[in-house]
């Protein structure tokens, strides 16, 4: 019997999540992972590396609670928001019995986490405007324990209609957990659902320091939920999810000075997004640029696969979305520096397709 044969059957059938880093490339313009384009400097202040870290670092929890305007007991910190996704499925879904539901085109880790754990994935594609198909969701809710909704949605960039979210929360009350993935909420803070926690005991909000806080390499995320949900998740999370250096840097990022710096970065990205969108809409091979509330834009490109490869060969790495439902011909472009935007603009302008 081979090692492969010893693995669980569902694991043998898995295809690993195709992250930007896994897909690789040898570019010098990296616009495929929705990262902040330049590094932010931090100094380590904690020198107690001979001791295990706090299971849930108090300074980080309290700082994030103040920032998100929730109570500390409503905050769980984890190794990125991706760990929060996995914890929710592990805690609330029985493998082989329960299901999760999500609405493509959307973030790929919902399915990867569920499939790894052995939980059924159900999909209800979004409508033509990428909003929720509420009747379709209601028809498929039987046996569903967790519903994932990404807002703003990755990769399409739009906010999910708040009334649709309220309708979904009423529809699932007493039946399922509803997870609002707000990885990109700093770019449209008015759209957060964190203030709804008191109204909906089954609402969970996922957050991260990877995007606007410019700390993708830190792997630090947050789950916001009512204390009853947090207490369930504390039963399944690893004892020390954040190393001491990670907690140290996260606390600095969440200081008043750190939050002010983040908001300056957001303003910078929004300015650059306006410039890039304006320029893209004047390029011959760009058929459509969709409105975005995030640090990336989705564009439909003539001969997109060939254009993607052409830019790849020039060292400009974008994210091909052709395999996502309803996104034929689409490429996703992270907002970078002005120089990086200009590289994309010049390369697309030169395409003869």
Swiss-Prot record:
The keyword Hydrolase does not apply. Its EC number is 2.6.1.9. GO terms for biological process: L-histidine biosynthetic process. It catalyses: L-histidinol phosphate + 2-oxoglutarate = 3-(imidazol-4-yl)-2-oxopropyl phosphate + L-glutamate. It holds the Pfam family Aminotran_1_2. One of its GO terms (molecular function) is histidinol-phosphate transaminase activity. Keywords: Amino-acid biosynthesis, Aminotransferase, Histidine biosynthesis, Pyridoxal phosphate, Transferase. Pathway: Amino-acid biosynthesis; L-histidine biosynthesis; L-histidine from 5-phospho-alpha-D-ribose 1-diphosphate: step 7/9. The modification N6-(pyridoxal phosphate)lysine is found at residue 211. Belongs to the class-II pyridoxal-phosphate-dependent aminotransferase family. Histidinol-phosphate aminotransferase subfamily. Homodimer. This is Histidinol-phosphate aminotransferase. The lineage of its organism: Bacteria, Pseudomonadati, Pseudomonadota, Gammaproteobacteria, Enterobacterales. The gene is hisC.
């Amino acid at each position: 019997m081979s090692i492969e044969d010893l693995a669980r059957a569902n694991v043998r059938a898995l295809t690993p999540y195709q992250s930007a880093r896994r897909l690789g490339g040898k570019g010098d313009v990296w616009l495929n992972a929705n990262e902040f384009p330049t590094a932010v400097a931090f100094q380590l202040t904690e020198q107690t590396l001979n001791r295990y870290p706090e299971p849930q670092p108090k300074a980080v929890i309290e700082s994030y609670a103040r920032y998100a305007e929730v109570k500390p007991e409503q905050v769980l910190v984890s190794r990125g928001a991706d760990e929060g996704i996995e914890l929710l499925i592990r805690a609330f879904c029985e493998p082989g019995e329960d299901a999760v539901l999500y609405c493509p085109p959307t973030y790929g880790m919902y399915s990867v986490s569920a499939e790894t754990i052995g939980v059924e994935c159900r999909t209800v594609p979004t409508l033509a405007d990428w909003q929720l198909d509420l009747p379709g969701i209601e028809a498929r809710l039987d046996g569903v324990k967790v519903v994932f909704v990404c807002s703003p949605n990755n990769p399409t960039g739009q906010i999910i209609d708040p009334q649709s979210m309220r309708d979904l929360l009423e529809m699932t009350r007493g039946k399922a957990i509803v997870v609002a993935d707000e990885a990109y909420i700093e770019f449209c803070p008015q759209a957060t659902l964190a203030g709804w926690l008191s109204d909906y005991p089954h609402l969970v909000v996922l957050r991260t320091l990877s995007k606007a806080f410019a700390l993708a390499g830190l792997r630090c995320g947050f789950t916001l939920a009512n204390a009853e949900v947090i207490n369930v998740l504390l039963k399944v999370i690893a004892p020390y999810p954040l190393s001491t250096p990670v907690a140290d840097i996260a606390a600095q990022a969440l200081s008043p000075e750190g939050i002010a710096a983040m908001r300056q970065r957001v303003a910078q990205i929004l300015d650059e997004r306006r410039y890039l969108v304006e320029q893209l809409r004047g390029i011959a091979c760009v058929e459509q640029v969709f409105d975005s509330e995030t640090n990336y834009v989705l564009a439909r490109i003539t001969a997109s696969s060939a254009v993607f490869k052409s830019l790849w060969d020039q060292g400009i790495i974008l994210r091909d979305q052709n395999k996502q439902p309803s996104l034929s011909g689409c490429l996703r472009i992270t907002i970078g520096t002005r120089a990086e935007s200009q590289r994309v603009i010049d390369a697309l302008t030169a395409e003869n397709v």
